[in-house]
Curated annotation (Swiss-Prot):
GO terms for molecular function: 4 iron, 4 sulfur cluster binding; 4-hydroxy-3-methylbut-2-en-1-yl diphosphate synthase activity (ferredoxin); 4-hydroxy-3-methylbut-2-enyl-diphosphate synthase activity (flavodoxin); iron ion binding. This is 4-hydroxy-3-methylbut-2-en-1-yl diphosphate synthase (flavodoxin). The gene is ispG. It comes from Bacillus cereus (strain ZK / E33L). Converts 2C-methyl-D-erythritol 2,4-cyclodiphosphate (ME-2,4cPP) into 1-hydroxy-2-methyl-2-(E)-butenyl 4-diphosphate. Keywords: 4Fe-4S, Iron, Iron-sulfur, Isoprene biosynthesis, Metal-binding, Oxidoreductase.
Length: 378
């Protein structure tokens, strides 16, 4: 059996201003729920997704009206845009012409070779990657006849077949997804895919369900896959506001230490010792830090006796007591604050630390740019 390709060993593929694969961080994606031809509504939803932390967004392109809207949408957003194409290769060509950053197709349902070749040539000319979207629910008839039902081996065979179509046309800017609604099937398919090729993998549990059930199902499946070192980009598929997909994705990546651009909340489960309204405070603080783009850890704890010690890794936190709270940094108490202002004081400290982290990150970026410049001049 081939060795599994770790996410850091996959081929880097450019998508707009991002690079997926290689040594780059996992990228969070989502998909709009609007009619793509409704530019105003689509842009408004994408703006909300951007604010929530979405890094790549996909839109359905079922008809010419949607394809013609791509250029207008692109002008008004800040993140890479992906066109989801099925059956009609001409829609892919129009989307590419409109400035799309990536095309998601299934080469098997685009039609004859000359149609696939037309899409590949257009993508190659513009430097646009193609995602091959394998789905357990829409495998080719001959694969289902061979295996009897959707299997991980059948999904990998489908992926390899489609990859070969593109490779035969000398196209290698490829990303692959192996989606299934069955968690165990998805885990097996992604693991076998990581052994079969080194293209970046887009992760997802398709049709996972409503906000609550879908979150649990996606976390179970994608968590197991991520823990194996597999995956370069992911989408949480929920029957909910797509902003919720982004929130869940950020939390999932933070749980595995795979997001350096997201804040983390640590809070205790409450008990009879608590003298403050911990649940509402934790929810308020979680909402406050939800859009921060720095890896700050914030703790909200109910017990002033054990709190600071239990959250030593937190950059900043509060531990409640009767009528007051302890404000602490890295497990060390900084000062006592009255209960009525402790949340506001915590927010002030969060702002200071977040600003420091952001400034430090900018310094690191400048250093990297200087190193690159020196390397190019040598």
């Amino acid at each position: 059996m081939n060795e599994m390709t770790h996410r850091t060993k996959t081929r880097p593929v450019k998508v707009g201003n991002l690079t997926i694969g290689g040594n780059n961080e996992l990228i969070i994606q989502s998909m709009t729920t609007t009619k793509t031809h409704d530019v105003e509504a689509t842009v408004a939803e994408i703006k909300r997704l951007e604010e929530a932390g979405c890094q790549v967004v996909r839109v359905a392109v079922p008809d010419e009206r949607a394809a013609n809207a791509i250029a207008d949408i692109k002008k008004q957003i800040n993140i890479p845009l992906v066109a989801d194409i099925h059956f009609d290769y001409r829609l892919a060509l129009k989307a590419i012409e409109g400035g799309i950053d990536k095309v998601r197709i299934n080469p098997g349902n685009i039609g004859r070779r000359h149609k696939v070749e037309a899409v590949v040539n257009a993508a190659k000319e513009r430097g646009i990657p193609i995602r091959i979207g394998v789905n357990a629910g829409s495998l080719e008839r001959h694969i289902l006849e061979k295996y009897g039902y959707p299997t991980a081996d059948g999904m990998v065979e489908s992926a390899l077949h489609h990859i070969k179509i593109l490779e035969d046309l000398d196209f290698h800017d490829i990303i692959v997804s192996m989606k299934a609604s069955d968690v165990n099937l998805a885990i097996e398919a992604y693991e076998k895919a990581a052994r079969a090729f080194d293209y970046p993998l887009h992760l997802g549990i398709t049709e996972s369900g409503t906000l609550f059930a879908g979150t649990v199902k996606s976390a179970a499946g994608l968590g197991a896959i991520l823990n194996k070192g597999i995956g370069n980009t992911l989408r949480i598929s929920l029957s909910a506001d797509p902003v919720e997909e982004v929130k869940v994705a950020r939390e999932l990546l933070k749980s595995f230490g795979l997001a350096s651009n997201a804040a983390t909340l640590i809070s205790c489960p409450t008990c009879g010792r608590i003298e403050i309204d911990l649940i509402s405070i934790a929810n308020e603080v979680e909402e406050y830090i939800s859009t921060l783009q720095v890896p700050i850890k914030v703790a909200v704890l109910g017990c002033a006796v054990n709190g600071p010690g239990e959250a030593r890794e937190a950059d900043i936190g509060i531990a409640g007591a009767r009528g007051e709270g302890l404000l602490f940094r890295k497990g060390q108490v900084v000062r006592k604050v009255p209960e009525e202002i402790m949340v506001e004081e915590l927010k002030k400290e969060i702002d200071v630390i977040a600003a420091e982290m952001a400034a430090e990150r900018e310094k690191e970026k400048e250093k990297e740019k200087e190193k690159e410049k020196e390397t190019q001049e040598q």
